[in-house]
C-alpha cells in the first residue's frame, strides 16, 4: 500500500506522452504521422486505462484503511519564500480519478469512430489527452497554487475543444464566450487564494483548514473580509460549473464535437467546480453565510436550468441546460452540508449524462446522412422523429439514460437525486418544494427530448413541402464549414409546424395528421416520395442509420454503469449486511444534516421517501407523453376533446401566458440579452470613448505640437530669405510692437 501511495505522483503524467509524441511526430515526420493518425487512439486509451487501474487500486485501499496520504516537495527560494508542490490522495481524489478515467476511456473509444472522417483527428486526440492530464493533476493537487495551475489548464483545453472547428464563426464566438465568462470566475478564484494566503500564511489544504478554523473560533479575523475571500473562491466554481449567473457559456459550448461535450459535462470541466467546492468544504462550513449562499445559488440554478430546457430545439443545448440543472442539485447538496449526497449525484450523473451525449452524437451522425454537415439541421429535434426503427440500440441506450436522469428506479440517478431531495426537507421546506417540483420538470423536458427524437415520423422528409428543390448534402470545407450559402426557407411539417429555419419551434407537439395519415403511415411516405409537387421526384431520400460497433460499444458500457453504479450508495443495513460502499469510501466525511443519526435507513423508510419523488417524476413523464407522444394528435380528433378545448374559459389568455413562458425559455430567460445590453454594450461604449480620448487628447497634444512647429517653421523660412530689406522690415516691425506693448503696459 505504501508503495502505491508513493507512486501516485505519476498519475497525472501517464497520459501526457501522447500529446508530446503527436507534436514531435508532426514536427519531424508530418506525412507519416498524418497517414497513421488512427494508431494514436490506442496509446491514448491504453495509458488512460493504466491510470484507471491505478485509481481503482487506490479506492480499494481507501475503503479498507480510510487513509489520507500527502507528499510535499519544498523548493526554498530564500529564507522568506519557499514553494511547495505535492500530491494528495484521499477519498475525493480516488472517486474523481475513477470518474475521469472511466468516462475518458469510453469517450476516447467512441471518438475514434466519431472523428475518423475529420482532418483534425490528431489535434482532437492531442487536446483530449492533455485534457485528461490537466483534470487528473487538478484532483491530485495538495495546495491552492497547484489547483489554480491545473484549473487554468483544464479551462484552456476546454476552450480549445469548444472552438475545435474554429473556422466556423459560431464556434469561435462560443470559445470566446466561454473564455471571457470563465475569466470572471478565475479572477475571483485568484483573489480568493491570495486573500486566504494573507490570512493564514499557508496554501496547503490541511494546514489552511486548521489555521483558519482556529482563527475563526478565536475571533482573530475580520469576518467580513473572510466572507469576501470565501465568496471569491466560490466564484471560480460558479463559472466553471455553469452556475447562475455565470452559466451563459455552457449552451454555446455545444459547438464543439459531441464526444468532448460528453467529457466536459460528465467528468472534467463542469465537474471541476463541484470538486473544488467539495475540496474546500471544511473551509466553507465555518462560515454559515457562505454555505447559505452556495445552497441559494444551487437552487436558483436547479430551477433556471430546468425551465430553460423545456423549449430548446437543439438536442445538445437541451442536454446542456439539463447538466446545468443537475449541477445545481450538487451545489445545493454541498450548500446544505450533504457532502455524500453531492458526490453520489456527481458520480451517477456523470455516467448517465455521458450516455445521453454519446447517444445524441449517434443521433446526429445518423441525421447527417440526410441533411449533410449542418448542425442547425442535424441537431434540430424538430426535423427528427421516428428513429426507433432506424437506430434501435441508440434508442434503447438513450431511453435508459433519460429514465435515469428523470429519477426512475432502479437507474443510477434515482438513488442520488432521492437522497438530495430527502436532505432538502431537513434543510429548508421551501428549498425542498422547489427541488421536488424541478424533479418533475426534469422528467418532462427529458422525456420531451426522447419523444421528439424517437417517436412519431421522420419529419426531415417533409422539409421540401414548399416545392423547391434542396439537395440533401452540403459542400464541406476542411473544418466542416459549409461552402454553399444558406437560404432562409420555410419548412412546413405537415400541420405539425410552420417555421423558418432560424425561428422557434412549437412548445407543444400538436400534430394534426389527416385521417389517411393516421391510418396508414406507409401511404404517407409513398405520397411524399412520388409527388412532384414537392420538387423531390428526382431526389432520392436517405434514412438515418445505426452507428457502428465502436460507438455502440461505449454506449452499451455506459448503459451498464447507469444500471449498476447507483448500488454503491445504497444505504441499507439489514441484519448485518452493509451495502453502502460509498460511505466506506468517503470516510472521513462531512454531513451537517445527519450528525446525530445513522447513515443507513430501513426498507420501509426508503419506500416512503422514494414514493413521493418517483410519483413526481412519473407525473412529468405523463405530461410530456400527453403533449409530445403522437397519440396526442389522435385525441385532438375526438369531438369530446375538441369540445373541451373550445369551452375552456379564457383559453386565449392561457395561450398567451404559455407563449410568454415559451418565449422566455427559448430566449434563455433573456439573460444573454441582458448581458448584451448592460455589460457588452456598455463596455463597447467605454472602449469607443477611450479610443476617442486617446486619439483626440492623448495623441492630440504631441500631434498638435508637431503640427504647430511645422507651420511656424514654414512661416519663418520666408523671413530668412537672404534679403537685407526683409531683415530690416521685420526688425522694425518687432521693435514697434515691443514699444507699443511697453506703452500699453508701463
Curated annotation (Swiss-Prot):
Gene3D superfamilies: 1.20.5.2700. Its EC number is 7.1.1.-. It comes from the Eukaryota. GO terms for cellular component: chloroplast thylakoid membrane. The chain crosses the membrane at residues 9-29, 40-60, 89-109, 121-140, 147-167, 185-205, 219-239, 258-278, 280-300, 327-347, 354-374, 396-416, 425-445, 552-572, 606-626, 726-746. One of its GO terms (molecular function) is quinone binding. Its main location: plastid. InterPro entries: NADH_UbQ_OxRdtase_chlpt_su5_C (IPR002128), NADHpl_OxRdtase_5_subgr (IPR018393), ND/Mrp_TM (IPR001750), NU5C-like (IPR003945), Proton_antipo_N (IPR001516). It holds the Pfam family Proton_antipo_N. One of its GO terms (biological process) is ATP synthesis coupled electron transport. Keywords: Chloroplast, Membrane, NAD, NADP, Plastid, Plastoquinone, Quinone, Thylakoid, Translocase, Transmembrane, Transmembrane helix, Transport. PANTHER family: NADH-UBIQUINONE OXIDOREDUCTASE CHAIN 5 (PTHR42829:SF2). NDH shuttles electrons from NAD(P)H:plastoquinone, via FMN and iron-sulfur (Fe-S) centers, to quinones in the photosynthetic chain and possibly in a chloroplast respiratory chain. The immediate electron acceptor for the enzyme in this species is believed to be plastoquinone. Couples the redox reaction to proton translocation, and thus conserves the redox energy in a proton gradient. NDH is composed of at least 16 different subunits, 5 of which are encoded in the nucleus. This is NAD(P)H-quinone oxidoreductase subunit 5, chloroplastic. The gene is ndhF.
Amino acid at each position: 500500500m505504501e508503495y502505491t501511495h508513493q507512486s501516485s505522483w505519476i498519475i497525472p503524467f501517464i497520459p501526457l506522452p501522447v500529446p508530446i509524441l503527436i507534436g514531435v511526430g508532426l514536427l519531424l515526420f508530418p506525412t507519416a504521422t498524418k497517414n497513421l493518425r488512427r494508431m494514436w487512439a490506442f496509446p491514448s486509451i491504453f495509458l488512460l486505462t493504466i491510470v484507471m487501474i491505478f485509481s481503482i487500486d487506490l479506492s480499494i485501499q481507501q475503503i479498507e484503511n480510510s487513509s489520507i496520504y500527502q507528499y510535499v516537495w519544498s523548493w526554498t527560494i530564500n529564507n522568506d519564500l519557499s514553494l511547495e508542490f505535492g500530491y494528495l490522495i484521499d477519498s475525493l481524489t480516488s472517486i474523481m480519478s475513477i470518474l475521469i478515467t472511466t468516462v475518458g476511456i469510453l469517450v476516447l473509444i467512441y471518438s475514434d469512430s466519431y472523428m475518423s472522417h475529420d482532418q483534425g483527428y490528431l489535434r482532437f486526440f492531442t487536446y483530449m489527452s492533455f485534457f485528461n492530464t490537466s483534470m487528473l493533476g487538478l484532483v491530485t493537487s495538495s495546495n491552492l497554487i497547484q489547483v489554480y495551475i491545473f484549473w487554468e489548464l483544464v479551462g484552456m483545453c476546454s476552450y480549445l475543444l469548444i472552438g475545435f472547428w474554429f473556422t466556423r464563426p459560431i464556434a469561435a464566438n462560443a470559445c470566446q464566450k466561454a473564455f471571457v465568462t470563465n475569466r470572471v470566475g478565475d479572477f475571483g478564484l485568484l483573489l480568493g487564494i491570495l486573500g486566504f494566503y494573507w490570512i493564514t500564511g499557508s496554501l496547503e489544504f490541511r494546514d489552511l483548514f486548521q489555521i483558519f478554523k482556529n482563527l475563526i473560533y478565536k475571533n482573530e479575523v475580520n469576518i467580513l473580509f473572510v466572507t469576501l475571500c470565501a465568496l471569491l473562491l466560490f466564484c471560480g466554481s460558479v463559472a466553471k460549473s455553469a452556475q447562475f449567473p455565470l452559466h451563459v457559456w455552457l449552451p454555446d459550448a455545444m459547438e464543439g464535437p459531441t464526444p468532448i461535450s460528453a467529457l466536459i459535462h460528465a467528468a472534467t470541466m463542469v465537474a471541476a467546480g463541484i470538486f473544488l467546492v467539495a475540496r474546500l468544504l471544511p473551509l466553507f462550513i465555518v462560515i454559515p453565510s457562505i454555505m447559505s449562499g452556495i445552497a441559494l445559488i444551487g437552487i436558483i440554478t436547479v430551477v433556471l436550468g430546468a425551465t430553460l430546457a423545456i423549449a430548446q430545439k437543439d438536442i445538445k443545448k437541451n442536454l446542456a441546460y439539463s447538466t446545468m440543472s443537475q449541477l445545481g442539485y450538487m451545489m445545493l447538496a454541498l450548500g446544505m452540508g450533504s457532502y455524500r449526497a453531492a458526490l453520489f449525484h456527481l458520480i451517477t450523473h456523470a455516467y448517465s449524462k455521458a450516455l445521453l451525449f454519446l447517444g445524441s452524437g449517434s443521433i446526429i451522425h445518423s441525421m447527417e446522412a440526410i441533411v449533410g454537415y449542418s448542425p442547425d439541421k442535424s441537431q434540430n429535434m424538430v426535423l427528427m422523429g421516428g428513429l426507433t426503427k432506424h437506430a434501435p440500440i441508440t434508442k434503447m441506450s438513450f431511453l435508459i439514460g433519460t429514465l435515469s436522469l428523470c429519477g426512475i428506479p432502479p437507474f443510477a440517478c434515482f438513488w442520488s437525486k432521492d437522497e438530495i431531495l430527502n436532505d432538502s426537507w431537513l434543510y429548508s421546506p421551501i428549498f425542498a418544494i422547489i427541488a421536488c417540483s424541478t424533479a418533475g420538470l426534469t422528467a418532462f423536458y427529458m422525456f420531451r427530448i426522447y419523444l421528439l427524437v424517437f417517436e412519431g415520423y421522420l419529419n426531415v422528409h417533409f422539409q421540401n413541402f414548399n416545392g423547391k428543390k434542396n439537395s440533401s448534402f452540403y459542400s464541406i470545407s476542411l473544418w466542416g464549414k459549409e461552402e454553399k450559402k444558406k437560404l432562409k426557407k420555410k419548412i412546413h411539417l405537415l400541420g405539425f409546424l410552420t417555421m423558418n429555419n432560424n425561428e422557434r419551434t412549437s412548445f407543444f407537439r400538436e400534430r394534426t395528421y389527416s385521417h389517411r395519415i393516421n391510418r396508414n403511415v406507409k401511404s404517407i411516405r409513398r405520397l411524399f416520395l412520388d409527388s412532384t409537387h414537392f420538387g423531390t421526384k428526382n431526389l432520392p431520400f436517405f434514412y438515418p442509420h445505426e452507428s457502428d460497433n465502436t460507438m455502440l460499444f461505449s454506449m452499451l458500457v455506459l448503459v451498464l454503469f447507469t444500471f449498476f453504479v447507483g448500488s454503491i450508495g445504497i444505504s441499507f443495513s439489514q441484519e448485518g449486511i452493509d451495502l453502502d460502499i460509498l460511505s466506506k469510501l468517503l470516510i472521513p466525511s462531512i454531513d451537517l444534516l445527519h450528525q446525530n443519526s445513522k447513515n443507513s435507513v430501513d426498507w420501509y423508510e426508503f419506500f416512503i421517501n422514494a414514493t413521493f419523488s418517483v410519483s413526481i417524476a412519473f407525473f412529468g413523464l405523463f405530461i410530456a407523453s400527453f403533449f409530445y407522444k403522437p397519440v396526442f394528435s389522435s385525441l385532438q380528433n375526438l369531438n369530446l376533446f375538441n369540445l373541451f378545448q373550445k369551452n375552456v374559459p379564457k383559453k386565449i389568455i392561457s395561450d398567451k401566458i404559455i407563449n410568454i413562458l415559451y418565449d422566455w425559455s427559448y430566449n434563455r430567460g433573456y439573460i444573454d440579452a441582458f448581458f448584451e445590453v448592460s455589460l457588452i454594450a456598455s463596455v463597447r461604449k467605454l472602449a469607443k470613448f477611450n479610443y476617442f480620448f486617446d486619439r483626440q487628447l492623448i495623441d492630440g497634444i504631441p500631434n498638435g505640437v508637431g503640427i504647430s512647429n511645422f507651420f511656424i517653421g514654414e512661416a519663418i523660412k520666408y523671413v530668412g530669405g537672404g534679403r537685407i530689406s526683409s531683415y530690416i522690415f521685420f526688425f522694425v516691425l518687432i521693435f514697434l510692437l515691443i514699444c507699443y506693448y511697453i506703452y500699453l503696459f508701463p
